[in-house]
Protein backbone atom coordinates (compact mmCIF):
# COMPACT_ATOMS: atom_id res chain seq x y z
CA UNK A 1 0.00 0.00 0.00
CA UNK A 2 0.86 3.67 -0.17
CA UNK A 3 2.98 5.25 2.53
CA UNK A 4 4.15 8.83 2.40
CA UNK A 5 6.84 8.48 5.04
CA UNK A 6 10.35 9.78 4.50
CA UNK A 7 11.80 6.28 4.58
CA UNK A 8 9.35 4.95 2.03
CA UNK A 9 10.06 7.83 -0.36
CA UNK A 10 13.80 7.25 -0.05
CA UNK A 11 13.27 3.57 -0.79
CA UNK A 12 11.20 4.38 -3.89
CA UNK A 13 13.90 6.78 -5.12
CA UNK A 14 16.58 4.14 -4.64
CA UNK A 15 14.49 1.52 -6.46
CA UNK A 16 14.08 3.88 -9.42
CA UNK A 17 17.84 4.51 -9.55
CA UNK A 18 18.55 0.77 -9.42
CA UNK A 19 16.07 0.20 -12.25
CA UNK A 20 17.64 2.97 -14.39
CA UNK A 21 21.10 1.50 -13.82
CA UNK A 22 20.03 -2.00 -14.84
CA UNK A 23 17.29 -1.76 -17.47
CA UNK A 24 18.39 -2.97 -20.90
CA UNK A 25 16.80 -3.47 -24.28
CA UNK A 26 15.61 -7.04 -24.84
CA UNK A 27 14.98 -7.45 -28.55
CA UNK A 28 13.69 -11.03 -28.16
CA UNK A 29 10.98 -9.74 -25.80
CA UNK A 30 10.26 -6.71 -28.03
CA UNK A 31 11.76 -4.23 -25.52
CA UNK A 32 13.52 -1.66 -27.71
CA UNK A 33 16.06 1.05 -26.88
CA UNK A 34 13.21 3.53 -27.29
CA UNK A 35 11.19 1.61 -24.69
CA UNK A 36 14.17 1.68 -22.34
CA UNK A 37 14.56 5.45 -22.74
CA UNK A 38 10.85 5.93 -22.04
CA UNK A 39 11.10 3.76 -18.91
CA UNK A 40 14.14 5.69 -17.70
CA UNK A 41 12.33 8.99 -18.23
CA UNK A 42 9.35 7.65 -16.30
CA UNK A 43 11.72 6.70 -13.48
CA UNK A 44 13.23 10.19 -13.55
CA UNK A 45 9.68 11.54 -13.28
CA UNK A 46 9.00 9.35 -10.24
CA UNK A 47 12.32 10.28 -8.61
CA UNK A 48 11.48 13.97 -9.03
CA UNK A 49 7.93 13.38 -7.79
CA UNK A 50 9.15 11.59 -4.65
CA UNK A 51 11.70 14.33 -4.00
CA UNK A 52 8.86 16.84 -4.34
CA UNK A 53 6.78 14.92 -1.80
CA UNK A 54 9.72 14.93 0.63
CA UNK A 55 10.49 18.61 -0.01
CA UNK A 56 6.84 19.52 0.51
CA UNK A 57 6.76 17.63 3.81
CA UNK A 58 10.23 18.39 5.19
CA UNK A 59 11.66 21.36 3.27
CA UNK A 60 15.38 20.72 3.03
CA UNK A 61 16.19 17.06 2.33
CA UNK A 62 19.28 14.98 1.51
CA UNK A 63 19.64 14.63 -2.26
CA UNK A 64 21.21 11.68 -4.06
CA UNK A 65 21.70 11.63 -7.82
CA UNK A 66 22.20 7.89 -8.00
CA UNK A 67 21.87 4.68 -5.99
CA UNK A 68 23.58 4.67 -2.60
CA UNK A 69 24.60 1.54 -0.77
CA UNK A 70 24.66 1.27 3.00
CA UNK A 71 28.47 1.28 3.06
CA UNK A 72 28.86 4.36 0.85
CA UNK A 73 30.83 7.17 2.53
CA UNK A 74 28.43 9.69 0.95
CA UNK A 75 25.36 8.12 2.54
CA UNK A 76 25.32 10.43 5.56
CA UNK A 77 25.27 13.70 3.64
CA UNK A 78 23.55 16.87 4.72
CA UNK A 79 20.39 18.41 3.41
CA UNK A 80 20.07 20.53 0.30
CA UNK A 81 18.26 23.81 0.91
CA UNK A 82 14.61 24.20 0.01
CA UNK A 83 15.56 26.64 -2.77
CA UNK A 84 18.13 24.20 -4.20
CA UNK A 85 15.52 21.44 -4.26
CA UNK A 86 12.94 23.71 -5.93
CA UNK A 87 15.45 24.71 -8.63
CA UNK A 88 16.36 21.06 -9.21
CA UNK A 89 12.69 20.02 -9.39
CA UNK A 90 11.90 22.89 -11.75
CA UNK A 91 14.69 21.81 -14.11
CA UNK A 92 13.79 18.12 -13.89
CA UNK A 93 10.12 18.58 -14.72
CA UNK A 94 10.89 21.08 -17.49
CA UNK A 95 13.38 18.65 -19.07
CA UNK A 96 10.96 15.76 -18.67
CA UNK A 97 8.18 17.73 -20.36
CA UNK A 98 10.34 17.71 -23.48
CA UNK A 99 10.89 13.94 -23.58
CA UNK A 100 7.76 12.37 -22.11
CA UNK A 101 4.90 11.46 -24.45
CA UNK A 102 1.91 13.75 -24.86
CA UNK A 103 -0.44 10.96 -23.81
CA UNK A 104 -0.85 7.22 -23.43
CA UNK A 105 -3.60 4.93 -24.62
CA UNK A 106 -6.20 3.99 -22.00
CA UNK A 107 -4.35 0.69 -21.58
CA UNK A 108 -1.44 2.65 -20.08
CA UNK A 109 -3.44 5.33 -18.26
CA UNK A 110 -1.77 6.92 -15.26
CA UNK A 111 1.74 6.95 -16.68
CA UNK A 112 3.88 10.09 -16.76
CA UNK A 113 3.15 12.54 -19.57
CA UNK A 114 4.30 15.93 -20.76
CA UNK A 115 1.27 17.64 -19.21
CA UNK A 116 1.77 15.85 -15.89
CA UNK A 117 5.37 17.11 -15.76
CA UNK A 118 4.28 20.67 -16.58
CA UNK A 119 1.44 20.50 -14.03
CA UNK A 120 3.75 19.36 -11.24
CA UNK A 121 6.27 22.02 -12.20
CA UNK A 122 3.59 24.73 -12.02
CA UNK A 123 2.33 23.44 -8.66
CA UNK A 124 5.85 23.32 -7.21
CA UNK A 125 6.65 26.86 -8.33
CA UNK A 126 3.33 28.16 -6.94
CA UNK A 127 4.13 26.62 -3.57
CA UNK A 128 7.67 28.04 -3.63
CA UNK A 129 6.26 31.52 -4.30
CA UNK A 130 3.73 31.33 -1.46
CA UNK A 131 4.22 33.25 1.80
CA UNK A 132 4.67 29.95 3.63
CA UNK A 133 8.20 29.62 2.24
CA UNK A 134 8.85 32.85 0.32
CA UNK A 135 10.26 35.31 2.82
CA UNK A 136 8.89 33.56 5.90
CA UNK A 137 11.05 34.41 8.90
CA UNK A 138 9.72 31.47 10.92
CA UNK A 139 12.57 29.43 9.50
CA UNK A 140 15.31 31.82 10.59
CA UNK A 141 18.21 29.87 12.06
CA UNK A 142 17.22 26.52 10.54
CA UNK A 143 20.55 25.50 9.01
CA UNK A 144 21.81 22.36 7.33
CA UNK A 145 25.00 20.52 8.27
CA UNK A 146 27.02 22.91 6.07
CA UNK A 147 25.72 25.92 8.00
CA UNK A 148 23.50 27.11 5.12
CA UNK A 149 19.97 28.31 5.76
CA UNK A 150 17.46 25.57 4.93
CA UNK A 151 14.99 28.23 3.76
CA UNK A 152 15.68 31.70 2.44
CA UNK A 153 14.13 34.43 4.56
CA UNK A 154 14.31 36.97 1.73
CA UNK A 155 11.03 37.59 -0.09
CA UNK A 156 11.42 37.23 -3.87
CA UNK A 157 8.58 38.63 -6.01
CA UNK A 158 10.20 37.03 -9.07
CA UNK A 159 9.08 33.63 -7.74
CA UNK A 160 5.49 34.66 -8.49
CA UNK A 161 6.45 35.63 -12.05
CA UNK A 162 8.18 32.29 -12.56
CA UNK A 163 5.15 30.44 -11.17
CA UNK A 164 2.76 32.43 -13.38
CA UNK A 165 4.89 31.70 -16.45
CA UNK A 166 4.89 27.98 -15.60
CA UNK A 167 1.09 28.02 -15.19
CA UNK A 168 0.69 29.83 -18.51
CA UNK A 169 2.94 27.29 -20.22
CA UNK A 170 0.85 24.46 -18.77
CA UNK A 171 -2.44 26.04 -19.86
CA UNK A 172 -1.13 26.73 -23.38
CA UNK A 173 0.17 23.16 -23.78
CA UNK A 174 -3.05 21.68 -22.39
CA UNK A 175 -5.16 23.73 -24.81
CA UNK A 176 -2.96 22.60 -27.72
CA UNK A 177 -3.77 19.02 -26.70
CA UNK A 178 -7.51 19.75 -26.53
CA UNK A 179 -7.62 19.86 -22.74
CA UNK A 180 -8.84 23.41 -22.12
CA UNK A 181 -10.12 24.80 -18.85
CA UNK A 182 -13.75 24.93 -20.02
Task: Please state what every model-predicted region is.
Residues 73-77, 148-151:
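Short beta-alpha connecting loops at secondary-structure transitions
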Residues 66-73:
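Short linear capping/connector segments at secondary-structure termini
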Residues 1-58, 74-109:
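Conserved, well-structured interaction surfaces
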Residues 63-66, 105:
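Short, hydrophobic secondary-structure boundary micro-motifs
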